[in-house]
């Protein structure tokens, strides 16, 4: 698979408008906060309802656009017309841990159709789309998956996410996995772990290679946006780590005194080979202790 020449572009506009879709989710909230702290960027986040705004700091509430229904084309067009984005980061997606991910009437419109609709709108608006996909498009039977490996997930969630992976001249799909804290739930690994009081199991044969949300936001800013020629699908990953070892690092970084019992019963390896992305961009992920500390410090 040939690569385009690596041409890094300095964003010449004084301010780059970044529209963050799904800004109250785990990833979207981190992306919104990160770009709000980044010079030269003007982020605007979306939420379907204003009810969650009280969970955000005041400076972020002022950056939120509420009341837009992304499943309604007219509503999306109105959003684009109001924001005039240069970049759209799609952080919307039903996550695997909730029941709706198994409902085709909900999973297919959000996970499979919406990214393609966004790419079309971005094309009309002259904007660039950064879409976030997942390692769950794979069954997890072999690990170190490459972009050309067939997506072999058997569940609706994995299949719907695969259908939503966009490949257009103005769109990049980053296939990855994330950890981080959430605004109002404990679906994710870190929030769930920090909420536990008694002993927990740490799976020694469940392998993870994703990134903290703050690191993913940094990669988008520093490695994706300056490369307008980058398009299509790329794997983005850190070095593989077991869930047991990851929880040990999280416990140490957050000062969580809890027993983590090693458990080898769950065997799954969805680790991603991101050599293609690294060769194109020069990105080298930090070691896991550093990634976890950065996640803690970001909050």
Predicted feature residues:
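N-terminal Rossmann-fold cofactor-binding loop
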Residues: 45-55, 69-70
């Amino acid at each position: 698979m040939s690569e385009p020449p690596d041409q890094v572009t300095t964003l010449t506009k004084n301010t780059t408008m970044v529209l963050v879709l799904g800004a109250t989710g785990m990833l979207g909230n981190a992306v919104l906060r990160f770009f709000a702290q980044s010079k030269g960027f003007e982020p605007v986040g979306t939420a379907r309802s204003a009810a969650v705004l009280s969970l955000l700091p005041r400076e972020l509430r002022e950056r939120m656009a509420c009341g837009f229904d992304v499943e309604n084309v007219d509503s999306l067009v109105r959003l684009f017309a109001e924001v005039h984005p240069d970049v759209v980061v799609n952080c919307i997606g039903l996550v695997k841990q909730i029941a709706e991910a198994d409902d085709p009437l909900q999973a297919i419109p959000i996970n499979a159709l919406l990214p393609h609709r966004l790419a079309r709108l971005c094309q009309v608006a002259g904007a660039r789309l950064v879409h976030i996909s997942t390692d769950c498009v794979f069954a997890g039977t072999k690990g170190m998956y490459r972009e050309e490996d067939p997506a072999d997930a058997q569940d609706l969630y994995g299949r719907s996410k695969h259908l939503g992976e966009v490949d257009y001249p103005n769109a990049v799909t980053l296939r990855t996995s994330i950890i981080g804290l959430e605004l109002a739930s404990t679906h994710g690994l870190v929030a769930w772990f920090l909420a536990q009081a008694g002993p927990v199991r740490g799976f020694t044969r469940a392998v993870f290679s994703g990134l903290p949300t703050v690191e993913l936001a940094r990669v988008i800013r520093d490695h994706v946006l300056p490369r307008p020629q980058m398009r299509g699908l790329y794997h983005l990953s850190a070095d593989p780590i077991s869930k047991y070892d990851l929880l040990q690092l999280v416990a140490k970084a957050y000062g969580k005194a809890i027993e983590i019992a090693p458990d080898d019963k769950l065997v799954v390896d969805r680790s991603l080979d991101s050599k293609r992305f690294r060769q194109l961009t020069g990105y080298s992920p930090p070691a896991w202790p550093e990634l976890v500390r950065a996640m803690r410090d970001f909050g």
